[in-house]
Amino acid sequence: MAHVRVRFAPSPTGFFHIGSARTALFNWLYARHTGGTFVLRIEDTDKERNSEAFLNVIYDSLRWLGMEWDEGPGKGGEFGPYRQSERDAVYREYLAKLTAAGRTYEKDGAIWFKLLGERYEVFDEHRKKTVTKVKTAPTVIEDRIRGRVERVEDEDFVIFRSDGNPVFHFVNVVDDIAMQITHVIRGEDHLSNTSKHVELFKAFGAPVPQFAHIPLILKQNGPGKMSKRDQGALIEEYQRRGYLSEALVNFLSLLGWNPGDDREKMPIAEIIRLFDLPGVNQSNARFDDKKLAHMNMAYLLELPADTFVQKARAFFESLGDNATAKAALAAEPAFFREVMLLSQPKIKGFEELPAYTAYFFTDEFATDAKVRDKVMGKGDPKARLRELIEALPGFDFSNDAAVEEGIKVLATKNALGFGDYQSVARLGVSGTNVGPSITGMFRVLGRERVRARLERLLNA
């Protein structure tokens, strides 16, 4: 196989979203799988909408996701510059080539690309004026995912607007030629443009790259393509919420690609080894935030203890004036560590930590009224609380198993179940019915804080 060169060409006109990240990922994976080159090219010709801030978001997001580019802004390369706003001389040079070949003309102040073929006039859809059509053979697109696609391109099209700026179709093709791109991997929504691009490649006498139009990512609920405005669409949001980039990359790789079996969680090295264009599906992929959350949870579970605690602390630091965050960061490091490790098996993301751990860092927490009514309305909860408080001095708080054994002994003694004591104990120490294991909560909080909290519930 000839050396593969792929490119990712985003526009810095908005925040970096899931669809763009998945397109970048498939290009990056294919380059890494084949030992090729991943080129980052910035399509920043829209002067009114471009933003350096959004450009930096693109750079930061790609790096956060681990998709370092081989050529492009900040890296250089023999085919630069890599920002379209800096390539006007290149576009003028290629325009001159087309003009010299008789393939352009001016109309209404714009420059048009002239298709080859017999011309004829037809009325437009309103039958008010005529439109020039061109008799051409269908343009054949050999797509690595869609197969053979034929489209009829029967109208000339603008390549330079009346304001003197080149249009997307022209700069896209010129840059792919100049940068020797061998494979164009992009969203299916670009398939309708591809016949124009093929005709331009042919007009320049350049080899047509291999095309691979990947499936769209659909909204989680309802029809249509996922857009920047949809919840969960922005990469920056996952960074802010404390998701692991490895989990997001793994999840994105499976949005439209199949490794050939039913595996879902895979290290990036394995994804690179397996990734190839024949494994990309034709059918669109539907975004599923619950699946992503479970994927993230699986990655969190695998983090070494020190790494998890370090990342948890960094997340709390990112919350600024959040009351729980301030209390957590002010706690003794050893206590903070114990609370975090107790929570690690239970959370799907770091964003859950403040609500999940708040009662560890303050004794002044609210009690969930619905949970209270449910727990305190079953049997004789006050009696169970008194029995539990009286038994605490005999509990070994040194480890979870010892605490569990103490509660079991108490339950057996009073002909009750472990859950009968667990429910009132959890309500007393946390004010809710969800959280880490009750035995772990007892161990981390310690005998005196547990006693004080249970007595507060008893006397409420």
Swiss-Prot record:
Pfam families per record: Anticodon_2, tRNA-synt_1c
Span of the annotated motif 'KMSKS' region: 225-229
Disulfide bridges in this chain: none
Enzyme class label: ligase
Predominant subcellular localization, coarse grouping: cytoplasm
Subcellular location: Cytoplasm
Binding site residues for ATP: 228
Xref: CDD domains: GluRS_core
Subunit structure: Monomer.
Name of the molecule in the record: Glutamate--tRNA ligase
Taxonomic lineage: Bacteria, Pseudomonadati, Verrucomicrobiota, Opitutia, Opitutales
Gene that this sequence comes from: gltX
